[in-house]
């Protein structure tokens, strides 16, 4: 490539990675350029771009995002419609506003060998918890116990309870239904763990539809309570 042997192919530079590679090579390359192309479509095929693809092309630096983060944001947007995350610009602004919390929380996510423990719902819950100022050290400890299945104290039993619940429900729920269940149940069990670990009072029972945290939109506003419904 540095010697100028670069094939742009029929796709031209319809991909930021191609353009970046050309720029970094320092070699002049002849190519066709399309002006005023719709960002919502692929230039070469005309096919509609995915939301994830459009977000990556936004005016913000989204190089830090990945499929896990974007699928999690999509789930939050569907469950809490007032967050307006189904719209590209609002989603991009939301991701940037809460980048610190999102990156901190997703560092605790691992690829589990037990499929029931891999859910966008669990990721969504710990991101929202981080947005509600649950300390990273407590989220990390909760998730460590959740993945390992080993506990050392009473508070950590809530992580084991969640683990058992998700493995059980994964046998009867699928897709969005399971993700919504994992979202709400993880949030509740994490809240119980955190409050118990810090000596606060917390209800032992979790009712369907209960959600212990606020969900915020890109402007920092709290999503209206009527959108807080479990699927």
Spans of features found by a protein language model:
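Short alpha-helix boundary/capping and kink motifs at helix termini
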Residues: 1-36
